[in-house]
């Protein structure tokens, strides 16, 4: 029984070596500087334009009440 399990494990490791598994450091999410250089930032992405367009300026009185978009 143990020899069959050893043969099966050897075959699996030969067909799917552990080096084929990507490491965490290879993921683009771990390198935010390179991800931002790709030009896929949320400031220039078309999906986020509708969110920015919906924000309108608040009247000056609303700045005291916590309205953020134009109080800066």
Curated annotation (Swiss-Prot):
Modified residues (4-hydroxyproline): 69
Residues modified to Pyrrolidone carboxylic acid: 55
Pfam family, one: Conotoxin
Keywords, alphabetical: Amidation, Cleavage on pair of basic residues, Disulfide bond, Hydroxylation, Neurotoxin, Pyrrolidone carboxylic acid, Secreted, Signal, Toxin
Tissue specificity as recorded in UniProt: Expressed by the venom duct.
Disulfide bonds: 57-71, 58-67, 63-70
UniProt cross-references to InterPro entries, sorted A to Z: Conotoxin
GO terms, molecular function: ion channel inhibitor activity; toxin activity
Signal peptide: 1-20
Subcellular location: Secreted
GO cellular component terms attached to this protein's record: extracellular region
Positions of the propeptide segment: 21-51
Coiled-coil segments on the chain, per record: none
Cysteine amide modifications at: 71
Family membership noted in the UniProt record: Belongs to the conotoxin M superfamily.
Domain comment as written in the entry: The cysteine framework is III (CC-C-C-CC). Classified in the M-2 branch, since 2 residues stand between the fourth and the fifth cysteine residues.
Name this protein carries in UniProt: Conotoxin TxMMSK-04
Species of the source: Conus textile
């Amino acid at each position: 029984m143990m020899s069959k399990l050893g043969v099966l494990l050897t075959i699996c490791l030969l067909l799917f070596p552990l080096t084929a598994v990507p490491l965490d450091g290879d993921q683009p999410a771990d390198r935010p500087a390179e991800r931002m250089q790709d030009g896929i930032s949320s400031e220039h992405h078309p999906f986020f334009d509708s969110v920015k367009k919906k924000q309108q300026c608040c009247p000056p009185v609303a700045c005291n009440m916590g309205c953020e978009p134009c109080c800066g």
